[in-house]
Amino acid sequence: MKLEFTEKNYNSFVLQNLNKQRKRKEYWDMALTVDHHVFFAHRNVLAAVSPLVKSLISSNDMKTTDELYITIDPNYLSPATVDQLLDYFYSGKVVISEQNVEELLRGAQYFNTPRLRIHCNDFLIKSIRRVNCLRYLFLAELFELKEVSDLAYSGIRDNFHFWASPEGSMHFMRCPPVIFGRLLRDENLHVLNEDQALSALISWVYFRKEEREKYFKKFFNYINLNAVSNKTLMFASNKLVGLENNSAHATLIESVLMDRKQERPCSLLSYQRKGALLDSVVILGGQKAHGKFNDGVFAYIIQENLWLKLSEMPYRAAALSATAAGRYIYISGGTTEQISGLKTAWRYDMDDNSWTKLPDLPIGLVFHTMVTCGGTVYSVGGSIAPRRYVSNIYRYDERKEAWCLAGKMSIPMDGTAVITKGDRNLYIVTGRCLVKGYISRVGVVDCFDTCTGEVVQCITFPIEFNHRPLLSFHQDNILRVHSHRQSVEINLQKIKANKSTTSVPLLPNSCPLDVSHAICSIGDSKVFVCGGVTTASDVQTKDYTINPNAYLLDQKIGEWQTLACPPEALDCPACCLAKLPCKILQRI
């Protein structure tokens, strides 16, 4: 009789004991020295995982009694990394982070271990973000990681307007010539306009003038001077004085300026590259007259006072929410004829004009508020049914591809007004909830820390309005809450609320702002509003219609301006500020 017995996890058991022997310096026959640190190991283990070690043993015709010594340059691999590599060789486990991924890639290259290289490659792909894509591109080029290189390049191209801005330029000025030239040559480069591309080129050259001046002539040809404003052309002309062999470039600039003097003034928009960005307000979904739900996606191009239809949503809904993050618009929730609180979530790619289905929200929501903070998408509060409010704040985790509970507000509310401060804090200001059996807007400010998942500051204040307020920051610690009946300035440092004499004028149709309107702050103290319900001129009839107009409020002077008429009158659409690529004008 014969019976076969197999030990469970025997391979792991053997390697664990070998690793213990290594750490106790038992039975070792090789040593790795890094900056006076000596690490002992077993030749047979390292030869099994590293072709480098196997090659050293075979090429030197080592006997079983010989000991192998390897000295590693500490400028290439640190002692801590070598220790981590040895743990990986013996256990097959490794913890990779943004801090150690570069040295682990060096270790994988040094010991010729392709599986570790694959792990590092996968980590870079899963963790790439706007703030690290420039560094990741450097790593990808250095270690020949094509997929990472393509993703990182796309991240830089799609966020060039950030990298070329004062906020991101400090790091971007170190961009290698081969990458910088490739970016300027890209027709889909996401610049604010061609002025930014030319200014970035000049700043990049002057950052290291002696070594980069030779690239200026080649890179200058990638700029469309006809799309650059006179002011920036004059600025560039003055900067050319400090560069050698600049006469040809100066002549080109002078030629463009002279042609403009002789021709009628025209918009520079038609000359911009396809990827140049247009500040736009995007309207999604909503309910039409007679109760029909809408799936249209419309964009109001602020600069041109022009409406365009971009796409159609994968579903029809009103009281949904939306937010933009880079080239994407995220939408979720809403109500339809059959369902009062949808869980569905989608992502719209403005560049490719395509939709991607996202995992459902944990619960169905209406009148929730979606917002982007630090490049991450959040959903704040909302209703799961009539008069049933939630305090949940959800975060969409791109790595896990799931909605996660980020934290909770101090009280359950829907219809909240939210403003971000930096890349960390959400200020959730007022919202609707049940007060003594009635739906009422409450005066509360929650400062939600997205890193800790906690409300780190909660301020309550009396309010005399039940409509939706407008928010803005004055200086660093003053939060302004503007409304028709009352405005409040909240000192976040002193935790004190003071009434303000300024107020928001009623809409030109004499209606107050409420949750049925699409409301969007567009910078420079200006607020965009469209849609929503309005009462009939004869108040005796108590009849309601949908507002067919769009308005722009200049808060500095307290006046409304009527804009181009939207394609459709919509009640409770979603609304967000987005940067659309110029190529959509060619696509329409």
From Swiss-Prot:
Subcellular location: Cytoplasm, Cytoskeleton, Perinuclear theca, Calyx
Kelch repeat placement: 280-327, 328-375, 377-423, 425-475, 476-525, 526-580
Modified residues (Phosphoserine): S149
GO cellular component, one term: cytoskeleton
UniProt KW keywords: Cytoplasm, Cytoskeleton, Developmental protein, Differentiation, Kelch repeat, Phosphoprotein, Repeat, Spermatogenesis
Pfam families: BACK, BTB, Kelch_1, Kelch_6
Domain BACK span(s) in chain numbering: 133-235
InterPro entries per the UniProt record, alphabetical: BACK (IPR011705), BTB/POZ_dom (IPR000210), Calicin_BTB_POZ (IPR048070), Kelch-typ_b-propeller (IPR015915), Kelch_1 (IPR006652), SKP1/BTB/POZ_sf (IPR011333)
Tissue: Expressed in testis and in spermatozoa.
Domain BTB: 28-98
Record GO biological process: cell differentiation; spermatogenesis
Main location: cytoplasm
Subunit-level organization: Interacts with CYLC1; the interaction may be relevant for proper acrosome attachment to the nuclear envelope.
Function noted in UniProt: Required for both nuclear and acrosomal shaping during spermiogenesis.
Name the UniProt record assigns to this protein: Calicin
Record organism: Mus musculus (Mouse)
